[in-house]
Amino acid sequence: MDTVALGASGPASTRLSLQLGDAQSGLRAVTESSGSAVVVHVGGDIDASNETVWQRLVTRSAAIAIAPGPFVIDVRDLEFMGSCAYAVLAQESVRCRRRGVNLRLVSNQPIVARTIAACGLRRLLPMYTSVENALAPPA
């Protein structure tokens, strides 16, 4: 996979070591692309203080994905994911589907699954336990 650092300068890394936008944002991300697929690995926190940075990251990364995709967002290294993060993902999922790309979320945290279910977002934000599973073609 080619590694692309969005919103940060300097060399890209496969580790979650890049700060996006404001160094105080608390959000780290690395975006990788391979063929039509794009994977974003995120860590840190997503809340109202960095919602704009999160929105920009998701939108720019999704734009790289080409149908049939998928566009995978790995949130396993997030320490906090506020409601604004789910709203951004749901909106981007709708935009991706219009382009023939499926947004897939990777998480092993029960709270993420419960939040998605409680908000009625299961169809828009299908969850996978690993990036490998999320990248696999549908059975």
How should these model regions be labeled?
Residues V4-A5, A12-T59, V75-D77:
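STAS-typified acidic loop motif
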Residues V30-E32, V106, Y128:
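General small-molecule cofactor/ligand-binding pocket signal
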Residues D45-L125:
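Amphipathic alpha-helical interaction surfaces in cytosolic regulatory modules
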Residues L125-S130, A134:
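Short acidic-hydrophobic, aromatic-tinged amphipathic segments that line or gate anion-handling sites
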Residues L135-A139:
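Acidic/histidine-enriched, glycine/proline-rich intrinsically disordered or flexible terminal extensions
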